[in-house]
Amino acid sequence: MITISLCMIVKNEEEVLARCLDSVADLMDEIIIVDTGSTDATKEIAARYTDKIYDFKWTGSFSDARNYSFSLATQEYIYAPDADEVLDEENRAHFRKLKEVLLPEIEIVQMKYRTVTEYNTVLNIANEYRPKLFKRLREFTWVDPIHETVRIEPVVYDSDIEILHKPTGMHSKRDFGVFERLVRNSGELSPKLFKMYIRELYLTGDKTDLSNAEDYLMHLSDTTMDVDVKKSVDSVLLKNYRLNGREYDFLKTFAKAIVNEPCAETCYEAGLFYMSKEDYAEASLWLYNAANETECLIDIHSSGDKALENLINCYMKMGEGYEDLIAVASQKLKDWKLPEESVII
């Protein structure tokens, strides 16, 4: 049976920490808690489960804190949960079985990740695989009988364990602060972080968050970029202009965005814009396109339930004669659901 160190970084998690640790503590051989500046009872709660509680001065980087927590581990594998995650009884049993049978060559175990509250800022699927269990010390091996080389890709196992993500609020404001600092300091983001920033801005950004990002996004919009990236940036700018009442900038950007085939988010923003003007006929055209004729790039809901709900509202506002269209859209809304899962690492 393998041994596991739980390594968790925390800050002000008194509301959820005990719930998380109650679900996993007996599965762990070591529990390490790294606190980045709690002002509530987080550390006192953690002390009920372990004496390995360490303070870490916040650097503005979650990776720095996680790397420090990993450096303290002493067991064969490291499990890295967040405080708002939980294992139910079925998945506790799966985890216990995994400890018993995991092959020593496995270096990363992925687990299904399902958000079960409304506070889902980045997922366009019901659940996804995420790397959660890591071999602490990696052994390098040679491969191929001739022209041999060292294997650098990790050996990854996709388990049947499902982690329940149960946040009690949005983390977007915290995340936006990190993104904005990175942009100020370096002027750019990695492709992965850029994608996450765009998605969080579009899904949860308010007027201030969107305004803060405008200069950065305008700079990107003026550069040569992939077509889909350009569409994503324009969609966020459209939301910014719509929420901040900048009609001229909205229409100017929208006119350019529809020269090529628009994405669902662009059509959805147009629908909301015309709804705000009480032009429900025009709004319905763009919402229909969002729900039926275009592909989403950022937010699957913009081509799914949100587009359909607003489309139905437009038809209802337009009065008699739209009963059949309402029925069709209502049935499609009833049938709509998030895709179940995809595999990422």
Task: Place the predicted regions along the sequence by residue.
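Acidic helix N-cap motif at the loop->helix transition within catalytic regions
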Residues: E15-A18, D40-Y49, E90
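Cell-envelope/extracellular polymer assembly enzymes that use nucleotide-activated donors
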Residues: T3-S5, E30
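Short, well-formed alpha-helical segments that are part of the catalytic scaffolds
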Residues: C7-L27
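Short aromatic/hydrophobic "clamp" motif used to bind/position activated sugar donors
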Residues: I78
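A conserved acidic beta->alpha catalytic loop
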Residues: S23, D35-I45, W58, D82
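Conserved donor nucleotide-binding strand/loop of the catalytic core
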Residues: E44-Y68, L72
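Catalytic-site signature of metal-activated, phosphate-bearing donor transferases
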Residues: D64-F70, P81, L87-N212
